């Protein structure tokens, strides 16, 4: 390969990247893959033009922890990583290679978008830029598609990260947007900064388009390598095992972590760390919709996907964003044969005009649809409470969990005692003189309601499969997941659901 191709663009562009903490595309690949394993394709694309080495994109195959992967990396030192006709063709070919090898595909994105000068050749045709997104959709759920966003992903190019399974963004450098701040000011009169329009922090905490926010490119690459370790190479295969590790216990029993008073908050992460192998928690969308937790972990070395309400944030109530976050994660796990563990402490879905106008019913239906569609092994645990449609969204008994477990203090009902008593007995309560007499009457009604939804009664009616002490929960989960690892998938024959999106 000519040295000028390996060097990429002019030295001034390399210097500019270095000043902002950005690596050269080939350096990124070298850090991502196993040493000496990268085999490049079409390095001489557009080689007759000295200003366009490799036509601004590096593609090829490699190994990551011994596993074959495919890679596309924009070279921002060449025309800002923009796309020409051969750029697009190279991306299409590596997608087709990933399809044929059934290998994970990494997109290392740092691109200003389409070259306007090449638009007729690269934009509208059957092998034009749109085919990239078509291919991504066809590959979705077949092979892992991982985006590391190191710089801009502008205009139509923003759909590359959008169609990936996970998007890792580098703070301060990564951005994605359909229209730049300059275009927004020209077209709609909005003055906005790049960070406000499409920066990494915004997308990882507000829009949800980003999944993981990293400080440096090295951090992003390390996270992506770790993430791949939880996934099978392709759909239909089990995720890889790892040596089992004991949990990193806080020294507290789960019953001590979870307050008996359902109105007191606690950190569900403390419960998760009592259950999963030490160091195995890999959170996705940590900064977005923080009232629900989603991430991979291991129990006795086996991969599970965890969906857990987080009472520490907004009481664990489900909102539009949290329902969207959970639904996407559930679909990801189901696509790649990753068993699902639901940890419920949910008062229900949020109510009010604001969320109704945002589409809370639609979003809730989406989450419940994802729960209903999943055919991987799935276990739900009622940690403290599961009220109303929150029970449905957290894979309650009607949604065919392989087991529905509960801690001893758990409560399942249409609504909590306080809300239920006020809803049913409001008029009678008002007839009782305010003061100690009314307080005693309300307390009596609440006690009667609690007796009606007693956990042992639910277990007697086969609503709950087992009431498990906290110190036995990890072992119970490990045994049950092992039992259902080989279960048959049952799906009605159809093309797909009509999703409530």
How should each PLM-predicted stretch be described?
Residues 1-501:
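Ligand-binding clefts of soluble mixed alpha/beta catalytic domains
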């Amino acid at each position: 390969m000519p040295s000028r191709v390996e060097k990429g663009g002019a030295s001034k562009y390399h210097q500019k990247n270095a000043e902002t903490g950005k690596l050269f595309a080939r350096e990124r690949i070298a850090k991502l893959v196993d040493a000496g394993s990268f085999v490049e394709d079409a390095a001489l694309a557009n080689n007759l033009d000295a200003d366009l080495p490799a036509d601004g994109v590096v593609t090829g195959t490699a190994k990551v922890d011994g596993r074959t992967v495919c890679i596309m990396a924009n070279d921002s030192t060449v025309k800002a990583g923009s796309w020409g006709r051969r750029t697009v063709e190279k991306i299409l070919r590596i997608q087709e290679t990933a399809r044929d090898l059934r290998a994970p595909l990494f997109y290392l994105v740092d691109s200003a978008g389409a070259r306007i000068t090449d638009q007729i050749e690269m934009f509208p045709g059957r092998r034009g830029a749109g085919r990239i997104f078509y291919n991504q959709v066809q590959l979705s759920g077949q092979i892992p598609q991982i985006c590391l966003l190191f710089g801009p992903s502008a205009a139509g190019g923003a759909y590359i990260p959008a169609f990936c399974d996970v998007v890792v963004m580098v703070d301060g450098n990564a951005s994605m947007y359909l229209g730049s701040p300059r275009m927004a000011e020209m077209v709609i009169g909005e003055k906005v900064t790049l960070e406000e329009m499409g920066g990494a922090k915004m997308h990882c905490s507000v829009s949800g388009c980003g999944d993981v926010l990293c400080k440096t490119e090295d951090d992003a690459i390390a996270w992506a390598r770790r993430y791949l370790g939880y996934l099978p190479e392709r759909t239909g295969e089990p995720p890889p095992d790892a040596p089992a590790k004991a949990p990193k216990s806080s020294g507290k029993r789960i019953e001590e972590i979870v307050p008996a008073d359902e109105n007191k908050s606690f950190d569900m992460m403390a419960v998760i760390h009592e259950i999963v192998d030490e160091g195995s928690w890999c959170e996705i969308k940590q900064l977005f919709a923080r009232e629900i937790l989603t991430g991979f972990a291991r129990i006795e070395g086996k991969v599970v996907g965890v969906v857990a309400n987080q009472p520490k944030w907004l009481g664990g109530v489900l909102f539009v964003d949290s329902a969207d976050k959970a639904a996407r994660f559930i679909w990801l796990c189901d696509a790649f044969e990753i068993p699902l563990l639901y940890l419920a402490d949910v008062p229900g879905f949020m109510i009010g005009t604001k969320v109704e106008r945002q589409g809370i019913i639609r979003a809730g239906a989406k989450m419940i649809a994802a729960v209903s569609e999943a055919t991987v092994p799935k276990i739900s645990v009622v940690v403290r409470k599961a009220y109303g449609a929150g029970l449905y969204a957290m894979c309650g008994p009607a949604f065919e969990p392989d087991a529905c477990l509960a801690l001893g203090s758990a409560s399942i009902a249409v609504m909590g005692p306080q809300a239920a008593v006020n809803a049913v007995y409001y008029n009678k309560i008002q007839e009782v003189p305010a003061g100690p007499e009314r307080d005693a009457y309300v307390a009596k009604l609440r006690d009667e309601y609690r007796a009606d939804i007693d956990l042992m009664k639910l277990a007697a009616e086969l609503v709950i499969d087992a009431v498990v002490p906290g110190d036995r929960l990890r072992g119970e989960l490990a045994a049950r997941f092992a039992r259902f690892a080989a279960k048959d998938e049952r799906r009605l024959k159809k093309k797909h659901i009509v999703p409530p999106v």
